[in-house]
């Protein structure tokens, strides 16, 4: 039912309203982190089914050119969603999207570039046509977990370090990153 509603909305925006800017669609935010809490009943299998359903509904409406982005997960550390998206949804998800909040010191040591290069390498091993993006990227220093705010974004260095992290990310072969928290 949810996939039908989403596909109807995308169809309305593209066909009725003439929006040509919709090229990709992300179904959910940090779903892997939600699934890590067993109390909510969410899982990889449920998300996978929703992605397959969405692809089917978009295709039924002639929206085959709208790419699905995923898994839109939190940092991949021990997370299996990255691998499962590459292997189980290979033909359905052409854009691999994750979120990452780094410590500013990681830019000094090129840790950002090293880790994103590794992430890109594993993506390329599976499918060289896939694209990697950071759907959210920012600096963790000063993050208030309770209020979910970046308390240091007004410091002169915040934007500088985000820009440095973005440059390292692009050097490693990634296609894009969205700076998150620059306007908190």
Language model region names:
Residues 1-93, 98-118, 144-162:
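Active-site cleft segment of glycoside hydrolase catalytic domains centered on the general acid/base Glu
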